[in-house]
């Protein structure tokens, strides 16, 4: 599986020259271990991979007993793994480092020693249980890894050429044309339904069997539920309650999370730790309400108002159709043909959130329920562009899952806040268009924002 993060690994190796370890954080099953081991095989003379979920006690004892004597530490490490390490030409991988925090703390001394490069991979690496007894090393560069994005899915499907066309047309703000748009949307629907978990994608590419794909996705969902019970530390019930309600909350027209559906009288201060846990575990994407669509969205963040999306839309589909344990092939095919009577808006909005987060955007939305009609509006997403123009850098986004829709909220937002805003977007299922200063983007162009 070709992944974009590989280029970041190459850049770290060439630019950093052993000054820092690289920590790759991501949800379980997004492909961290696979891509790091591929990198080790391709870019180093030798490597050692220590899986802290499944390693010898003798290896763990090395970190407790020999960090003061690194010559002996490395001698035993090479003996235990039967691998010869070469200074500045070998890599040591700490896989699932959250399972053994002492190894993460040791990075300070190992990097200072300078003999080898180090990559750490982990999930839940910032959760209190995994860091409370260690000093987090400053000699550590952290990057996030997400489920496969649409371009990576196209690579897996051997459809690279169409992505280049999509990029070219986005740059020129020109439509793809009927035939190529239809092909791009067909591929995008496959991506949305299968999701971006590498094993699910690989199975789909090899078999085109949705039932096998669904079995894999449900195993991942079960793994996430087990992680909540294991790592949520006193918050298990709250985190599980939120996690299980994500599909039904997104099914509603107004997708703000309603705590009253968990417990009457529930308050955000009781549950904000649970939402934080899901966001840090990268199992969910939290979208915060902003009090105004203006520059400095973090300053306008409203903690009491949020939406909670699944980090992977393929997993959301398997959660939403959970009645029969394994979703039937016929249901998947109806979903593929857009003939399943379901509120597809929740799937489309979820995958837009997923793509924006993977691009590096923090997620915000804006809503105003004023009695004045001109002030009453709901904007699905606000994103900050990297450069501030004369009109600042906030772009409002509305997401539409059907061909027939209105954009009254977006039009009101542009009228009221025109001096604050950059380009407004409608993300929809049709081809690219531009009208009255609003850019209408097909779903598959979202990752280019």
Language-model region placement:
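Conserved lysine of the Walker
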Residues: 32
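A cross-kingdom feature that marks ATP-driven nucleic-acid transaction machinery
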Residues: 2, 13-22, 29, 38, ...
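Interdomain hinge/linker elements that couple catalytic modules in large macromolecular machines
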Residues: 158-348, 354, 362, 368
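Conserved P-loop NTPase "ATPase switch" module shared by AAA+ and STAND
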Residues: 85-102, 255
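Conserved catalytic segments around the Walker B and adjacent sensor/switch elements
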Residues: 43-58
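Short glycine-rich substrate-engagement loop in P-loop NTPases that contacts/grips substrate
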Residues: 54-88
């Amino acid at each position: 599986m070709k992944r974009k993060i590989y280029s970041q690994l190459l850049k770290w190796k060439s630019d950093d020259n052993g000054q820092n370890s690289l920590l790759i954080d991501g949800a379980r099953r997004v492909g961290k271990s696979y891509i790091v081991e591929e990198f080790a095989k391709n870019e180093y003379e030798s490597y050692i991979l220590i899986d802290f979920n499944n390693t010898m006690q003798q290896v763990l004892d090395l970190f407790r007993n020999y960090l003061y004597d690194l010559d002996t530490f490395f001698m035993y490490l090479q003996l235990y793994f039967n691998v010869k390490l070469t200074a500045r030409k070998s890599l040591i991988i700490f896989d699932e480092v959250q399972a053994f925090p002492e190894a993460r703390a040791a990075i300070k001394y190992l990097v200072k020693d300078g003999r080898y490069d180090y990559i750490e991979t982990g999930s839940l690496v910032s959760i209190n249980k995994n860091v409370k007894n260690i000093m987090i090393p400053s000699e550590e560069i952290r990057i996030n890894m997400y489920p496969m994005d649409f371009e990576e899915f196209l690579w897996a499907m051997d459809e690279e050429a169409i992505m280049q066309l999509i990029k070219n047309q986005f740059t020129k703000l020109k439509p793809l044309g009927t035939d190529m748009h239809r092909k791009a949307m067909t591929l995008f629907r496959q991506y949305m339904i299968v999701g971006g978990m590498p094993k699910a994608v690989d199975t789909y590419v090899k078999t085109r069997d949705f039932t096998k794909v669904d079995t894999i996705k449900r195993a991942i969902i079960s793994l996430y539920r087990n992680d909540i019970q294991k790592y949520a530390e006193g918050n298990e019930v709250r985190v599980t309650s939120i996690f299980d309600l994500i599909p039904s909350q997104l099914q509603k027209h107004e997708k703000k999370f309603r705590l009253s559906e968990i417990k009457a009288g529930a308050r955000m201060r009781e549950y904000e730790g649970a939402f934080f846990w899901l966001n840090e575990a990268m199992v969910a994407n939290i979208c915060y309400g902003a009090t105004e669509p203006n520059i400095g969205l973090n300053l306008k963040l409203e903690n009491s108002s949020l939406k909670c999306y699944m980090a992977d839309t393929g997993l959301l589909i398997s959660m939403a159709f959970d009645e029969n344990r394994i979703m039937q092939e016929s249901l998947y095919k109806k979903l593929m043909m857009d003939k399943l009577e379901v509120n597809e808006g929740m799937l489309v909005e979820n995958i837009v959130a997923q793509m924006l987060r993977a691009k590096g955007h923090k997620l915000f939305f804006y809503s105003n329920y004023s009695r004045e009609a001109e002030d009453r509006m709901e904007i699905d997403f606000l994103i900050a562009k990297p450069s501030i123009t004369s009109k600042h850098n906030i772009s409002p986004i509305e997401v539409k899952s059907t061909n027939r829709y209105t954009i009254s909220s977006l039009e009101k937002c542009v009228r009221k806040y025109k001096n604050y805003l950059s380009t407004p977007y409608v993300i929809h299922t049709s081809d690219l268009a531009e009208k009255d200063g609003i850019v209408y983007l097909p779903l598959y162009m979202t990752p280019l924002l």
